[in-house]
């Protein structure tokens, strides 16, 4: 129902992937077919707000060009020296990407998380909803056991944003919180190494704010 709603009412479009569930071996888990990604998006659709979209992480691009592992991109790039079809495909992709860099100084056709952010931003902007950047969340506003908004920071100091229908903390987990991941991941407890391509600033602030507001956090990955 959620996917149908977003595709019907917003700019969101999804495509299936070949990814397994995170835990395909548990009851109800599936080895393939359930996961979806945002459909690739041309960010010129954002108009004057296009420069506000943060570029993708360099670690998941090739000279700034994004791939979508659910389509033919990776297959062709792996086979471009073995197949004429793949060679032509890769050549066209590279030429188009170089044009984008020359004209816009960044990739225009984005995939995965960048496409998700761009499509959600386009949907919000079309509805007249302001998108505040450089406005870090400070704490969840809690009155009489009810979440009523967020306190945020900014150039003019802290201010409160009130919410009548709830608050969504979409903060990307806690991949750079050394103490928390040490408790959460069994491979670290057994002496293994943990590497993440996420920004170093992604230290779990959202999780801590939720806990402070009284939320239950389950760190079991089993």
Model-identified regions with their sequence ranges:
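Conserved redox-cofactor binding core of oxidoreductases
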Residues: 2-157
């Amino acid at each position: 129902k959620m996917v149908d709603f977003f595709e019907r009412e917003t700019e969101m479009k999804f495509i299936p992937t070949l990814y397994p569930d995170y835990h395909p071996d548990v009851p109800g888990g599936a080895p393939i077919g359930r996961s979806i990604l945002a459909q690739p998006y041309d960010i010129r659709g954002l108009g004057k707000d296009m420069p506000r979209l943060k570029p993708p992480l360099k670690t998941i691009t090739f000279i700034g060009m994004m791939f979508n592992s659910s389509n033919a991109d990776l297959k062709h790039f792996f086979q471009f020296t073995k197949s004429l079809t793949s060679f032509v495909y890769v050549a066209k992709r590279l030429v188009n990407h170089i044009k984008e860099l020359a004209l816009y100084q960044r990739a225009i056709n984005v995939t995965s998380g960048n496409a998700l952010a761009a499509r959600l931003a386009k949907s919000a902007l079309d509805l007249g909803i302001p998108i505040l950047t450089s406005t870090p969340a400070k704490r969840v506003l809690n009155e009489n056991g009810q979440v009523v908004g967020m306190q945020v920071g900014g150039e003019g100091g802290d201010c409160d944003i009130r919410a009548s229908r709830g608050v969504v903390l979409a903060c990307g987990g806690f991949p750079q919180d050394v103490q928390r991941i040490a408790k959460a991941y069994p491979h670290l407890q057994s002496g293994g190494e943990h590497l993440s391509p996420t920004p170093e600033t992604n230290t779990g602030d959202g999780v801590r704010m939720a806990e402070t507001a009284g939320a239950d956090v389950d760190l079991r990955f089993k």
